[in-house]
């Protein structure tokens, strides 16, 4: 099954219908990011069984024209947010790759699910949709992923790590580190070497490594 089919099915469930209705009401008087057409974009790229890596973010960027539906990613032409700068620093430290393109859709096209734990946010109000009920969607995503094996989970920060018990730890690889935010990246994220560890695991299990 494609991830796109999965999310279409989820939008028919009452919990997600309620979330969407709540957001539609908010949009009568408030700007919400990302744009409506991009809110489920992370599910657009591949089949569920093609999932190689899951990167779990928090909520989308709340400044205008930044969030694009993929966690940590921004479109070309935008300034790099602090978290993405630190992700690229960690990548260079690990694999000596000097990445400058802030659009991570090339990762998504290789089977990297770039999923936020909360999929929407009010403009200039971080965590404003934190209690909207997205937890059920994330749990359903992880339930689908339990049918797969040899997937690498990159859990950055406490919010991402709170989902660790939903992962089959015997059949997959879980890599945890502090969040790449400028407030916490110095607590181990910058030197975690998750990118090489991820690819080593994929190669070991006869899966194509990610071109970071």
UniProtKB/Swiss-Prot annotation:
Coiled coil: none annotated. SUPFAM superfamilies: Uracil-DNA glycosylase-like. GO terms for biological process: base-excision repair, AP site formation via deaminated base removal. It is found in: Cytoplasm. Its EC number is 3.2.2.27. The active site is at 59 (proton acceptor). Belongs to the uracil-DNA glycosylase (UDG) superfamily. UNG family. This is Uracil-DNA glycosylase. The gene is ung.
């Amino acid at each position: 099954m494609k991830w796109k089919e999965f999310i279409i099915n989820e939008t028919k469930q009452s919990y997600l219908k309620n979330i969407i209705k709540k957001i539609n009401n908010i949009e009568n008087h408030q700007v919400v990011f990302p744009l409506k057409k991009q809110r489920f974009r992370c599910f657009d790229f591949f089949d569920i069984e093609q999932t190689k890596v899951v990167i779990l973010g928090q909520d989308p960027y709340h400044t205008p024209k930044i969030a694009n539906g993929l966690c940590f990613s921004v479109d070309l032409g935008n300034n790099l947010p602090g978290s993405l700068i630190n992700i690229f620093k960690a990548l260079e430290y690990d694999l000596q790759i000097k990445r400058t393109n802030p659009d991570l859709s090339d990762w998504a096209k290789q089977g990297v699910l770039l999923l936020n734990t909360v999929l929407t946010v009010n403009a200039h109000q971080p965590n404003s949709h934190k209690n909207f009920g997205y937890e059920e969607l994330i749990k359903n995503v992880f339930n689908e992923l339990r049918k797969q094996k040899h997937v690498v989970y990159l859990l950055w920060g406490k919010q991402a790590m709170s989902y660790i018990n939903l992962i089959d730890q015997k059949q997959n690889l879980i890599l945890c580190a502090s969040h790449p935010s400028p407030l916490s990246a110095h607590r181990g994220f910058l030197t975690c070497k998750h990118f090489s560890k991820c690819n080593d695991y994929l190669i070991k299990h006869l899966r194509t490594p990610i071109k970071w």
